[in-house]
Amino acid sequence: YNYNKGKEVKHMIQTYRNHTPRIDATCFVADNATIIGDVTMKADASVWFGSVIRGDKDHIEIGEGSNIQDNCTLHTDPQHVLTIGKHVTVGHNAILHGCHIEDEVLIGMGAIILNGAHIGSHSIIGAGALVTEHMQIPKNSIVVGCPAKVIKTISAQQIQEIQDNAMHYAQLGKEYKEM
């Protein structure tokens, strides 16, 4: 099925072990993104150029209005589903592996989040941060470093910026679908 307005596009959307990705018709998937297996994308989500989403070991869910920017890798292990809430931004080159991301979170460019980690809503994970296995990040946190640590509480203005960024990417995805 072509998710980009009837253009002849060779997406790498593949069935694996009888699991075919379920992608809402309102989603944008870049031409060279790869989505395999047990993956669900909710309304207005987007996956950008060069990203790989492999639901070959367990389920991956990308919430409504969330965006997976260029060259990201999303993967799982058995018993480590990957769940991304609503209006989440996953910055360029980030790696998410078997973790849970609540609503309205910004994952900075190049950040790595490992199995069993849980990121609370309205949080920012700084660029290049390493969130280790099973780490629990409380909601409203700003997190940086390798290994990651909470450095302060997010401001109302920063929460608004997270929301605005997610809305911007939802609109951008609609524009790209029209190209």
Cite the ranges covered by each PLM segment.
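Short, Lys/Arg-enriched N-terminal segments with co-localized hydrophobic residues
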Residues: Y1-H11
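C-terminal segments of enzyme domains that contribute to small-molecule binding surfaces
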Residues: M12-A25, A30, L82-V90, A94-I95, ...
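Left-handed beta-helix
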Residues: A25, A30-D31, I36-G37, K42-A43, ...
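Active-site cofactor/substrate anionic-group-binding motifs, chiefly glycine-
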Residues: I60, V81
